[in-house]
Design a protein with these regions (language model features):
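N-terminal targeting leaders characterized by basic, low-complexity, disordered sequences
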Residues: 1-39
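Basic/polar, cationic surfaces and motifs that engage anionic cell-wall
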Residues: 2-3, 40-43, 48-52, 63-87, ...
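Generic cytosolic/nucleocytoplasmic N-terminal low-complexity/intrinsically disordered segments
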Residues: 8, 17, 37-38, 72-74, ...
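A generic alpha-helix propensity feature with a strong bias for hydrophobic helices
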Residues: 11-13, 22-24, 90, 97, ...
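Compositionally biased, intrinsically disordered/low-complexity regions enriched for serine, proline
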Residues: 16-18, 22, 30-33, 74-77, ...
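Intrinsically disordered, low-complexity segments enriched in small/polar residues
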Residues: 28, 35, 44, 70, ...
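Hydrophobic core
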Residues: 57-62
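Active-site-adjacent loop/helix surface patches within enzyme catalytic domains
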Residues: 79-209
């Protein structure tokens, strides 16, 4: 029996036929290089790039938070035990009373006052007792009282106090100022109290990164002759110079 085999004829490519695309070359490691713009972040190189971008964003965010805390309203309020050898007694007014509204703010000013109370015994401790009673029902408060030997701290520096008489005016004494009362009691040493107030002012300016141009008088915010003795004597510029001298020591 004879079996016949018919061989298939070879296929001829048409002269107009397009060549079949070749597969993409593989790298030495046997992997094809990633296609640009497609699933790039799914590749090792893409993941490294993404990680680098995330790190850059995190570093920038941390730097921004640090700047805000350093320069903004979130800076922790100071609570010194002493300032250049002058003892500081912290005795905050209770939260929720009329004289402590609890409004947090950015510190922009240190506002200088005098108590206006020349009576014997009207020192810093006496004014601390007074403000703890008065602030229960009245919108009256300040941050520090200073006499010739000590300082009382009545409110956190980052909270509003009612001392400047300008309500909550933007960039005002109440909203953005730390109120310091200087005692003028006749049985005290006024000049030494002023010197201690200069030390405290220098400390606060240094802590909050402010210059002496941020020292204000009560009378800068409303029409009131305060600090009266200092203003009447034309001694405020000398007070600012004294503050600068203490700042230079810090």
């Amino acid at each position: 029996m004879t079996i016949l085999f018919t061989l298939p004829k070879p296929r001829r490519r048409s002269p107009t036929a397009k060549p079949r695309p070749r597969t993409r070359p593989r790298s030495a490691a046997g992997r094809r290089p990633p296609r640009p713009g497609k699933n790039f972040f799914h590749t090792p190189a893409g993941r490294r790039t993404l990680l680098a971008l995330i790190l850059v964003v995190l570093v920038a965010a941390m730097a921004g938070v640090s700047w805000w805390r350093y320069n903004g309203k979130n800076k922790e309020p100071s609570q010194p035990d002493e300032v250049l050898g002058v003892p500081v007694h912290t005795d905050y007014l209770p939260e929720g009373i009329e004289g402590r509204p609890g409004i947090q703010r950015q510190v922009k000013w240190v506002v200088i006052h005098e108590t206006g109370n020349p009576a014997a015994g009207s020192n810093a401790a006496a004014h601390n007792t007074y403000i703890h009673k008065k602030a229960q029902t009245d919108s009256l408060s300040w941050h520090y009282t200073v006499d010739e030997s000590e300082i009382y701290h009545h409110l956190p520096d980052n909270e509003v106090a009612w001392h400047a008489g300008d309500k909550l005016t933007k960039n005002g004494g109440n909203l953005n100022g730390i109120g310091i009362e200087i005692c003028i009691n006749e049985d005290g040493n006024y000049d030494q109290a002023v010197d201690n107030a200069a030390k405290l002012t220098a400390y606060l300016l240094h802590y909050y990164k402010l210059g002496t141009d941020h020292i204000k008088q009560h009378g800068d915010f409303i029409s009131k002759n305060c600090p009266e003795i200092m203003r009447n004597a034309g001694a405020f510029p000398a007070f600012v110079q004294k503050v600068q001298g203490y700042l230079d020591q810090m």
